[in-house]
Amino acid sequence: MQQNTLKLLLKVLGRKLLVNFLKYKKYFRKTSLKQENIGEQFLIEVASKKPKNFLEIGVFHGVTARNVCELLYNIHKDDFKYVGLDLFGESAENSEEIIPNTKFNNPLKKIYFKYVLKVDPYSLEAVKKLLKKFKNNIHLIQGNSNNILHKIDMSKIDYVFLDGGHAYNTVKNDLTNL
């Protein structure tokens, strides 16, 4: 990790908050930022920009959303907005998209979500539950970015995390609409 980045973050967040957010939490769910230190590097990047209006395309299980909301809350308190756009499950509308593997390999996670929480971890409902602490700061949109992204006022967005559909036309559309 670069020394200048750490100094900047220490100045922005203070020692206690810096130590707290350097650990990317997985909340007993799947995440695309699972490789060692990738989640931490991502949070450092976001913290260095201090966005107040964050857009995530491709929310998946909501792990990155929760980490980002925790970070933005530590920086701005309640003065931030998080917008998350995702398919939140398979449907006829998104049958052509490449859907990430939503199955858990760990049988305890299967039991936990199916019988304890009684919710599909990939559903809009499950992500809302994970983010309920920030219910006044979040706006989750269910749908395909090919049809919805152009309706979002990008002039109000400070930071975009693009991790949605991986099909060529979807990526091209997302980049064009940003």
Write out the residue ranges for each language-model feature.
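Membrane-proximal basic amphipathic "stem/tether" segments
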Residues: 1-34
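S-adenosylmethionine/decaboxylated-SAM
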Residues: 27-30, 35-178
